[in-house]
Amino acid sequence: TFMGALKTFAFDGARVVGVPMEPDGMDLNALEDQLRQQKNVKFIYVITTFQNPTGYTTSMEKRREIYALAQRYDVMILEDNPYFELRYSGEYVPPLKSLDEDGRVFFAGSLSKILSPGVRMGYAQANRQLIERMAQSRMASDIHCNLFFQAVAAEYFNRFDLDAHIA
């Protein structure tokens, strides 16, 4: 799990509860037990591709089941997926966000892994209301991301083939 995420959650007063991992993703029985037992669960946090520290990738079947559990227990999913562009072998597994029918999945990706580690810039896909709240929170905390790196990233995406760069 990304330590930056855990520190952010703790700073905001969250009580983080771990769920054991299996080679194909979260232990779904343990996840459902936690969803049933815990009060006021706000979201499921999951790194679906090359989970840290195990390196496991959540299977598509388990992604569907995680989404179904989130619907059943009416919780959001934070899919932290900074590595999904970096698969060089094996079968591509679409992000959990691709299953999202009701604005329940917040997808976070990273440009640091695919453009330059020093850039430390990411992107998000979520429902409009959540993106607007996130933007307001970001502006209140540090005004904005480095404009120069935003412009460099935008220009790169406009001019070059990202898939060829990663391959």
What are these regions, as identified by a protein language model?
Residues E101-A167:
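Conserved core segment of the aminotransferase class I/II
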Residues T1-A14:
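Substrate-binding/gating loop at the entrance of the active-site cleft, primarily
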Residues D24-R87:
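Active-site phosphate-binding strand-loop segment of PLP-dependent enzymes
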Residues D12, R72-Y73, G103:
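Helix C-cap/helix->beta junction micro-motif
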Residues G13-P23:
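Short beta-strand->loop structural element characteristic of the AMP-binding/adenylate-forming
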